[in-house]
């Protein structure tokens, strides 16, 4: 079906003509923003939602520590803690990430400056940004609050995430990565379930991407947990590109489909426990990994093998065959899609354009899936009065 010409985006200047977070000439900025948004292929619903977000954002003005009231903690990770907060002057609920850094003022100012690029990241597949500021030894990054949380939290409640749902997730992640690359020349650098956020309107958005080189450098020591999603070429310290993000997406999809981090791969016994039936395929043929001498036997999900030490895990990613989905429980298209994401040589790995036209994505795009309904029933959220079908996907 041919795409109809998008209606122009309507953004109303803030009543007092005040600038967004300290930028001048609000009206000129709005015109430039309208032009950028019209270049995106948005459907009517996505257009209206982006308009509403940007119109609300204009009322926010400059962000200050005193203007926030803590509601609850949403999670911790990547060197920071995220709180659900109320921005008292505007009445908006936001997510506020606090990153404690012992750094010189010049570095701090550079980080805040680099984070300003986020004001220009406006897409249905990217978490909205209200602003960043520094106070009391902490950098604050204020974002749109996504009431469904992150997919790692959803996975804990769901046990496993169904293939149809993961189809919609895959589309959103590919479109989000494509937007960052094409419009901003940015790589994500940290794709994993905890950086894919969802909400009760059925939206699926990426957060925590590497927009500030200085922030990445300043937080280098806190990235240990993330290494388990890094591509082999990145772990080996060689040149890496957006192809590295595709590996991370593939690994995340296998994790969400089977219900646990997929390295080492589950053996036949564990797969039978997971899926309640005998499962065919290579994943079921993995020989049990010998237990490290002197290490106690501990439970690892349904797997009786002990968890790997980080160095064993990274060695496995670089030197062993990549994970794959067990056959017999997932469609051939989904299995092939994941296999193309998890090719160890980045030059042979599928790129974003190839993935966008893959049979699994085409099928998922055509499927009517009530993502919002599934999410709300899975995590016990109230659904908005106008349910949506995998909004914007």
From Swiss-Prot:
U0126 binds at residues 97, 208-211. Gene3D superfamilies: Phosphorylase Kinase, domain 1, Transferase(Phosphotransferase) domain 1. K-252a binds at residues 144-146, 194. Residues 270-307 are annotated as: RAF1-binding. It is an enzyme of class 2 (transferase). The modification Phosphoserine is found at residues 218, 222, 298. Residues 68-361 form the Protein kinase domain. Phosphorylation at Ser-218 and Ser-222 by MAP kinase kinase kinases (BRAF or MEKK1) positively regulates kinase activity. Also phosphorylated at Thr-292 by MAPK1/ERK2 and at Ser-298 by PAK. MAPK1/ERK2 phosphorylation of Thr-292 occurs in response to cellular adhesion and leads to inhibition of Ser-298 phosphorylation by PAK. Autophosphorylated at Ser-218 and Ser-222, autophosphosphorylation is promoted by NEK10 following UV irradiation. GO terms for cellular component: axon; cell cortex; centrosome; ciliary basal body; cytosol; dendrite cytoplasm; early endosome; endoplasmic reticulum. Ras proteins such as HRAS mediate the activation of RAF proteins such as RAF1 or BRAF which in turn activate extracellular signal-regulated kinases (ERK) through MAPK (mitogen-activated protein kinases) and ERK kinases MAP2K1/MEK1 and MAP2K2/MEK2. Activation occurs through phosphorylation of Ser-218 and Ser-222. MAP2K1/MEK1 binds KSR1 or KSR2 releasing the inhibitory intramolecular interaction between KSR1 or KSR2 protein kinase and N-terminal domains. This allows KSR1 or KSR2 dimerization with BRAF leading to BRAF activation and phosphorylation of MAP2K1. Changing residue 222 to D: No effect on BRAF-KSR1 dimerization. Signal peptide: none annotated. GO terms for biological process: Bergmann glial cell differentiation; cell motility; cellular senescence; central nervous system neuron differentiation; cerebellar cortex formation; chemotaxis; endodermal cell differentiation; epithelial cell proliferation involved in lung morphogenesis. It is a peripheral membrane protein. It is found in: Cytoplasm, Cytoskeleton, Microtubule organizing center, Centrosome; Cytoplasm, Cytoskeleton, Microtubule organizing center, Spindle pole body; Cytoplasm; Nucleus. The proline-rich region localized between residues 270 and 307 is important for binding to RAF1 and activation of MAP2K1/MEK1. This is Dual specificity mitogen-activated protein kinase kinase 1. It comes from Homo sapiens (Human).
